[in-house]
């Protein structure tokens, strides 16, 4: 596997031919390092292709086949998540969990509020809190800045995994790293594990 530069894009080449996505689009990106990483994933494959060992290829396929032609719908879905964001729903008890949520989530939330220039409403438990239209409009303006299709596909994946547009924006804007994003998204679960231990089936 190698990389071919053509028409301002870097194509993944297999045996001299341009690789294609499942939807038959050319597997090509605007970044040479990304293209080289894609080629390395393909080069590492044995006789049988194992998609599970090709996370970057899966992301780029998703970006080119599922996001590139549906950018507005993908952006709109991220904004919808902001309307019921996981970080806005806080525990009322026990006190250690309440404190942990405040310690971990509140700085991230405050950072994103400062970034977008708008405030989120918080709720306790599962009572729905409708976010102000101004807040969602501010989120939409910043989601619109996420480059497509690759970064947008990555952001959509993060949102799906975390249930949080706030965490997605924080990661996309370099406010937190991937490990902190994951830890924040699984704060409640990690707290329960700390109390009750690891669920063997979940593990």
For each feature predicted by the language model, list its residue ranges:
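An internal, amphipathic alpha-helical element
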Residues: 130-201
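Internal, conserved structured core segments that host functional sites
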Residues: 72-138
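An N-terminal structural lobe/cap that precedes and organizes the functional/catalytic core
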Residues: 1-69
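Short, charged/polar micro-motifs that form catalytic or ligand-binding hotspots
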Residues: 25-28, 94-98, 152-157, 171
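Short coil/turn segments at secondary-structure boundaries
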Residues: 51-54, 124, 197
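Solvent-exposed alpha-helices and their adjacent loops that cap or buttress functional pockets
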Residues: 4, 20-21, 80, 144-147, ...
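Generic secondary-structure signature for well-ordered alpha-helical cores
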Residues: 43-47, 110-117, 171-176, 186, ...
């Amino acid at each position: 596997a190698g990389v071919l530069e053509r028409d301002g894009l870097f194509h993944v080449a297999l045996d001299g031919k341009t690789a294609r996505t499942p939807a038959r689009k050319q597997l090509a990106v605007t970044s040479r390092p990304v293209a080289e990483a894609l080629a390395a994933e393909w080069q590492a494959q044995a006789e049988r292709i194992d998609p599970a060992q090709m996370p970057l290829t899966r992301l780029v396929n998703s970006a080119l086949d599922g996001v590139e032609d549906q950018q507005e719908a993908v952006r709109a879905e991220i904004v919808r998540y902001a309307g019921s964001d996981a970080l806005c729903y806080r525990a009322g008890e026990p006190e250690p969990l309440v404190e942990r949520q405040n310690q971990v989530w509140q700085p991230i939330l405050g950072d994103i509020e400062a970034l977008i220039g708008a405030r989120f409403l918080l709720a306790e438990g599962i009572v729905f809190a409708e976010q102000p239209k101004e807040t969602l409009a501010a989120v939409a303006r910043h989601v619109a800045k996420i480059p497509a299709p690759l970064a947008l596909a990555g952001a959509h994946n993060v949102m799906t995994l975390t249930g949080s547009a706030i965490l997605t924006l924080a990661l996309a804007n370099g406010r937190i790293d991937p490990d902190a994003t994951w830890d924040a998204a699984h704060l409640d679960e990690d707290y329960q594990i700390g109390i009750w231990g690891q669920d063997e089936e979940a593990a």
